[in-house]
Amino acid sequence: MDVNHFLISSLLERWRSETHTFHFPHGETTVTLEDVVVLLDLPIDGDVVTGPITVQDIFATFHEHLGVIPPPTVIRGNSIRVSWLNSTFQQLPPNANNEVIAQYARAYILKLIGSILMPDTSAARVHVMYLLRLANLNVVRNCSWGSAVLACLYRCLDHGIHLRQENIGGCMILLQCWAWESVATGIATGGRTEKIKWV
């Protein structure tokens, strides 16, 4: 889905970090956990999605959970390039055993986190702490991923207005779908509905 940059820019202009709400002429509104559940179907109850900010041996972590050791050129600090994940885990090998299937599943979820759900401003890197949360795929659904996505979006909106960034991180699909669903697109005037031009 393409992101409507004009819509996102207009929303960003109305964002207030003090209240984590958008200020419109008709009042304040914001993306809520309920919106995350309805629009993304992510769990909002369960274990907090958190982890260590630094990982002692990032190469060992990738080898343990993904079965490969990434080249040092794709790692910066405690994050890895999403493009490397895309190219390395493109096609599941035929006759893959359960361990390889789990490694590819972790890589796929990690790509989703880094490029769609909780991307940074570049949407090009993902933090290794999320890989640690994916270690046991049987309990991944027990984490409050929706809360993490919403917190990341709020933080990215805050940074977007305070740091005057060119690009903004966070789940833009959530923000855009929420705007289409929640922000008034029409008003009743004399029995008919007219479009509001607020963007």
Task: Enumerate the language-model features and the residues they cover.
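N-terminal leader regions that mediate targeting or early regulatory function
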Residues: 1-154, 170
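Extended, charge-rich alpha-helical regions
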Residues: 81, 85, 174-175, 180-199
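Helix-loop junctions that connect tandem helical modules in alpha-solenoid scaffolds
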Residues: 98, 159-160
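Generic N-terminal leader/processing signal
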Residues: 109, 165, 193-195
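Flexible helix-coil junctions and inter-repeat linker/turn elements that act as hinges
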Residues: 118-122, 162, 183-184
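Acidic, serine/threonine- and proline-rich low-complexity regulatory regions
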Residues: 160-168
